[in-house]
Amino acid sequence: MSTTQKDITIFESTSSTAPLILLNTVQNEGEQVYNSVVSMTDVDFSMAAIGNLAWNREMTPWPAPAVMRGGEDFAGKADGYLKELTGTILPDILAKISAKPEYMALAGYSLGGLFAVYALYRTDLFDRAVSASGSFWYPDFLDFVKEHRFCRKPARLYFSLGNKEAKTKNPVMKTVEERTRELYRWYQ
């Protein structure tokens, strides 16, 4: 399925109330993620993997300079992408699946994990969020979280972080573990 220049792959459950997970993908790894999760759980769910994203533009909440030498600046267009996601992409997905999801969750890795949490402050459509190695080092994100409220308190938040992320020499990115822990404490 292709909508608004995004590539969308739907993995549909046969259950009429299976939750729907929306996964923003870095490199169209949706099928790999879906198969991995299916192999680890008996929980029935549908998943829509969304690819062909302008990662540094659409996953970032506000403009910020690049953190890698020679890297692309962050454009801060998350609100625009969220409008596209909730106004066009999600309705198209819901029209294509037969289930009426029990709940919907937003998931992502890296900047996609940052976006998953940020989106909870901008829309009440999602009941849960998954942030795998979320880019919580992003400038001013902790301040944003502390100064704003969720549109709808999520039933669940899941954070994970690998062993290597905080060991980078990059002074901005190396704060990711400390900031992830701080967010965890804030949400308790």
What are these regions (language model features)?
Residues V37-V38, L120, Y184:
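A conserved amphipathic alpha-helix that caps or lines the catalytic cleft of carbohydrate-
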Residues L23-N24, A132, L161:
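Alpha/beta-hydrolase
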Residues Y118-R128:
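Conserved hydrolase catalytic core segment
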Residues S16-L20, V43-S46, E102, L125-D127, ...:
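Loop/turn elements at helix/coil->beta-strand transitions in domains of secreted/extracellular proteins
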Residues K6, T14-K96:
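Serine-hydrolase catalytic machinery in alpha/beta-hydrolase-like enzymes
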Residues F136-Q188:
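The feature captures the conserved acid-bearing segment of alpha/beta-hydrolase catalytic domains
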Residues A107-G112, A116:
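Gly/Ala-rich beta-loop-alpha elbow adjacent to hydrolase catalytic centers
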Residues Y103-G108, A132:
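Short beta-strand immediately N-terminal to the catalytic nucleophile in serine-hydrolase-like folds
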